[in-house]
Amino acid sequence: MRHAKRGRKLGRDAAHRNLMLGTMAGQLITHGRIKTTEAKAKELRGVVDRLINIAKRDDLHARRQAVKVLKDKRVVRHLFEEVAPDLDDRTSGYTRILKLGPRQGDGAEQVYLELVNHRVE
């Protein structure tokens, strides 16, 4: 029975899942919006919210924690210098999910996951 089991496995082992979520978090921070499946977006929401809360502290340890997840110092710099200061007035809820409908090939529910301060050009 799955009582009190948190998180989704997304059909991957732990290392693959963590690397995928870190990469997707970096893409979301860089571009402000990504298109993905609903299950991945719901799992990624928590990762990004934690990263933004870490970035709000803006100290050396916070940067090292962010690099541990994101693996790219340029993305970390963007997170700390541009994204986190814009979201400083919020305590949580940094992302939103916009449903797009099922994918043509396999019927997986597609969504946009975006930062709430993202401006669509």
Swiss-Prot record:
Keywords: Ribonucleoprotein, Ribosomal protein. Pfam families: Ribosomal_L17 (PF01196). GO terms for molecular function: structural constituent of ribosome. GO terms for biological process: translation. The keyword ATP-binding does not apply. InterPro entries: Ribosomal_bL17, Ribosomal_bL17_sf. One of its GO terms (cellular component) is cytosolic large ribosomal subunit. It comes from the Bacteria. NCBIfam families: L17. Belongs to the bacterial ribosomal protein bL17 family. Part of the 50S ribosomal subunit. Contacts protein L32. This is Large ribosomal subunit protein bL17. It comes from Rubrobacter xylanophilus (strain DSM 9941 / JCM 11954 / NBRC 16129 / PRD-1). The gene is rplQ.
